[in-house]
Amino acid sequence: MKIDLNADLGEGCASDAELLTLVSSANIACGFHAGDAQTMQACVREAIKNGVAIGAHPSFPDRENFGRSAMQLPPETVYAQTLYQIGALATIARAQGGVMRHVKPHGMLYNQAAKEAQLADAIARAVYACDPALVLVGLAGSELIRAGKQYGLTTREEVFADRGYQADGSLVPRSQPGALIENEEQALAQTLEMVQHGRVKSITGEWATVAAQTVCLHGDGEHALAFARRLRATFAKKGIVVAA
């Protein structure tokens, strides 16, 4: 069995360099919620050095709230903003001898695109326009995954090691209790259940079906690196290969 491990980078976390030794894919902030041209260059350089797949992490234009503010923008605006961000990272990667492989939206752009078909379509269209060979990463079973498939893109369905789930397979909003799993044993058990058995227990006790093709590791938690190492070790024991 194979699984991709991804992390969001270039967002100002001190753990970026070490996380790149533990993951197989990097989602690099493109300036709209965090990062700038120099951090994008630095992250690409380190990803290439570690053999990690390079990906863009586009966002709503919301540096003030780290891309976590809900926005109602016209689809054409979202299309243009997404194309702008991923095009910039693709060029930075190419200039350093690398290749951008995937795109994963950030924060509220990701969450809204999981449920809003027009927004999902705008993102998928931008990814296709940039490069039809790019992989589109989205929440398992989401509108974004469906939109990517409609455009003929390769999609990758994502699950979260440290996030609580609702009965419909969506994430518990960060503003609600149960959104974050802080117990490492619980997070490990949830991740294995999703990867090995394709299901997750919701905060209300029901099982939700999920297709786990990539697991997101958050690098901004207090114990992020320690958990990443434990997860890698657990996968190794279970014979699960980590690869993009």
Curated annotation (Swiss-Prot):
GO molecular function: 5-oxoprolinase (ATP-hydrolyzing) activity; ATP binding
Keyword Transport: no
Key words, A-Z: ATP-binding, Hydrolase, Nucleotide-binding
Pfam families on file: LamB_YcsF
InterPro entries the record matches: Glyco_hydro/deAcase_b/a-brl, LamB/YcsF/PxpA-like
Function noted in UniProt: Catalyzes the cleavage of 5-oxoproline to form L-glutamate coupled to the hydrolysis of ATP to ADP and inorganic phosphate.
Family listed: Belongs to the LamB/PxpA family.
Oligomer status and interactors: Forms a complex composed of PxpA, PxpB and PxpC.
Name the record gives this protein: 5-oxoprolinase subunit A
Upper lineage: Bacteria, Pseudomonadati, Pseudomonadota, Gammaproteobacteria, Enterobacterales
Gene label: pxpA
